[in-house]
Amino acid sequence: RIGDHALDIYEFSLKLEPYKDLKLDEIEGLSLFVVKMIENSIKAYVNKDYELAEKVIKDDDYVDEKYAEIIDKLSKNEYSIDGKCLPFAIYTTLVVKYLERIADHSVNISEWVVYISNGFYKDKKIF
């Protein structure tokens, strides 16, 4: 799934090429943050690192906040996007949504690390 979303992001980035002057720095920062979440969730799984898994789970709150913030700004046109640039807003929305979904997949990996560590999955004891 993460790979599918990454491919979708790549395809939308090609469609965003004509609008490169409208680049949003927030998306680059968000993407780097999400990549770090992926790395940390895999590292937590390999090393059975409960604390790192918990960090990834908490980091998702930041991604959710940034997602909502960017979508809100796009919907209110706070980026002063010309009406001719509607595709920019649409493709950017999709890119940000896929980044948020990738972060969610990192959380899923981390939730299973927590389960492996203590038998709890989403705060419920499972045997």
Please give the residue ranges for each predicted region.
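Cytosolic, long alpha-helical scaffolding segments
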Residues: 1-127
